[in-house]
C-alpha cells in the first residue's frame, strides 16, 4: 500500500509504508486507520510534569543540548540530578561552548580573557567544568553548529572528542554492524536494552550527506528486521528536522537540509507505522518544546506524527518561543528531558527544570554567586 509523503525532492512522491501499515490500511483510509492502529500499538507519547504519577519505568536516561554561555554553571546541576535519579546515561546534543565570543561563565572567572586565549581553552573547559561533573555516568556527545566554528573543524572535533565518539557501547555496536558500520565520528548509534539510540550530525550545511543517509538507512532496516529485538528508536540531533514548530531555526535554513531532513522524517514515520516506538529529539533552539511535528505541514499527510522535542536548555542564552510552539512549551528555563523506558516498549519523557538553588548547590569551588544569579535571571534574548 502506498501513501503520499514528501521525499528528497521536496515534492509529493510515493514512498512505501512499513508492513504494519501495509497490512491494515488503504490509501483512502490512511489517516483514520493509522490513528487507530498506532494507538493499539501504544505509539503515542505523553510528556508529564515531574509531579505526575506514572508506572515505574524499567530504566531512565537524560538528554539536553546547548550548554554554551552559562553551561559551566548549569551542567553541574544537570549532572547532580542525573546521578541522584540513577539515569543510565546523559546525551548532549551539541553546542558545548560559544566559540565566536567568550562564554559568560568563563568571563565571570576571567574577566580580562582575550578571544584567542578563550578559543584555545574552551573545549578543555567544557570537559573540565561540564562533563567531569557526571563522574562515572556515561556521556554521549552530538555535534552542534558551534563545534563547526573555526578554528574547530569536523576532523578536529573527531580528534578532540574521540574517547566519547568511540565509547565501549559504540565500539561494540560497530562490531555488531560489521562492514556497514560508520567509522568513529559525529554520527553513530548504540543499542541499550531494546532501544536503539541514534546520533545524527546536522551541524553543517553539508548534511545530511549521502554517506550519512546510507548509514542511517542501514540502521533503520536493521531495526525493522524480524527478530531484531528493537522496540523503540530514539534519534538525537542538534537541529530539528524540517517543518517543525521550530522551523525558524532548524534544517529548514538550507536547501540540502530541508530536502534530506524531510526524507529522514519520512523514514522515521515509516518505522513508527511499522510498529516501532519512535522519538526525535533536537536542541539548537534554546527552549523546551514538545510535539514539534504536530504542524499543518506534516499533518496534511497523517494525523499521527512522530513525537518530537526541542530541549536546548543546558545553559545557552534563552530564546523567545515561536508562535507555533505547543501550549506546554517553556522558555527562560534551564533543564533536561528524562526518558523513562516502559515495559511495553514506549518511552515517557519528562521535563526536569532546574532552580537557581540547584545551580548554587552544584557549583564549582570559587564560582561567584552573583555570576550564577546573573546567568539564571538574565542570559536571554528578547527579540530574534
Regions found by a protein language model. Give the residues of each.
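N-terminal secretory signal peptides that target proteins for export/translocation
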Residues: 1-29
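Bacterial N-terminal signal peptides
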Residues: 33-45
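Cleavable N-terminal signal peptides
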Residues: 39, 50-52
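N-terminal active-site segment of His-dependent metallophosphoesterases
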Residues: 52-117
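Extended active-site neighborhood of metal-dependent phosphoesterases/phosphodiesterases
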Residues: 60, 104-229, 252-277, 287-340
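Active-site glycine-centered loops adjacent to acidic/histidine catalytic or metal-binding residues
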Residues: 66, 94-95, 144-145, 238, ...
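Short acidic, glycine-rich surface-loop motifs adjacent to enzyme active sites
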Residues: 223-250
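A short C-terminal boundary segment appended to hydrolase-like catalytic domains
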Residues: 326-384
Amino acid at each position: 500500500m502506498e501513501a503520499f509523503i514528501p521525499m528528497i525532492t521536496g515534492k509529493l512522491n510515493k514512498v512505501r509504508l512499513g508492513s504494519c501499515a501495509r497490512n491494515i490500511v488503504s490509501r483512502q483510509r490512511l489517516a483514520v486507520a493509522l490513528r487507530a492502529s498506532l494507538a493499539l500499538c501504544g505509539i503515542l507519547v505523553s510528556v508529564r510534569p515531574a509531579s505526575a504519577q506514572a508506572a515505574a519505568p524499567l530504566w531512565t536516561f537524560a538528554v539536553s543540548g546547548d550548554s554554551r554561555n552559562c553551561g559551566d554553571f548549569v551542567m553541574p546541576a544537570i549532572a547532580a540530578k542525573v546521578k541522584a535519579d540513577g539515569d543510565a546515561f546523559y546525551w548532549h546534543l551539541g553546542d558545548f561552548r560559544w566559540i565566536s565570543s567568550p562564554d559568560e561563565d568563563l568571563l565571570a572567572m576571567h574577566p580580562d580573557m582575550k578571544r584567542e586565549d578563550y578559543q584555545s581553552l574552551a573545549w578543555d573547559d567544557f570537559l573540565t567544568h561540564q562533563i567531569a561533573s557526571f563522574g562515572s555516568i556515561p556521556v554521549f556527545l552530538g555535534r552542534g553548529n558551534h563545534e563547526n566554528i573555526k578554528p574547530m573543524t569536523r576532523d578536529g572535533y573527531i580528534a578532540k572528542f574521540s574517547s566519547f565518539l568511540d565509547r565501549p557501547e559504540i565500539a561494540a555496536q560497530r562490531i555488531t554492524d560489521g562492514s556497514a558500520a560508520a567509522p568513529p565520528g559525529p554520527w553513530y548509534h548504540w543499542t541499550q536494552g531494546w532501544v536503539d539510540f541514534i546520533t545524527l550530525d546536522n551541524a553543517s550545511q553539508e548534511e545530511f550527506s549521502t554517506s550519512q543517509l546510507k548509514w542511517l538507512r542501514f540502521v533503520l532496516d536493521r531495526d525493522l528486521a524480524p527478530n531484531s529485538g528493537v522496540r523503540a528508536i530514539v534519534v538525537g540531533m542538534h537541529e530539528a528536522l524540517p517543518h517543525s514548530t521550530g522551523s525558524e531555526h532548524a534544517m529548514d535554513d538550507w536547501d540540502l537540509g530541508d530536502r534530506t531532513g524531510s526524507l529522514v522524517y519520512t523514514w522515521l514515520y515509516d518505522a513508527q507505522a511499522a510498529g516501532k516506538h519512535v522519538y526525535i529529539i533536537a536542541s539548537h533552539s534554546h527552549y523546551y518544546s514538545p510535539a514539534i511535528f504536530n504542524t499543518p505541514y506534516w499533518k496534511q499527510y497523517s494525523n499521527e506524527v512522530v513525537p518530537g522535542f526541542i530541549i536546548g536548555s543546558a545553559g545557552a542564552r534563552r530564546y523567545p518561543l515561536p508562535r507555533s510552539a505547543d501550549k506546554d512549551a517553556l522558555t527562560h528555563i534551564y533543564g533536561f528531558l528524562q526518558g523513562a523506558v516502559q515495559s511495553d516498549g514506549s518511552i515517557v519523557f519528562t521535563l526536569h527544570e532546574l532552580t537557581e538553588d540547584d545551580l548554587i548547590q552544584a557549583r564549582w569551588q570559587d564560582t561567584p554567586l552573583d555570576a550564577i544569579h546573573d546567568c539564571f535571571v538574565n542570559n536571554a534574548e528578547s527579540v530574534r
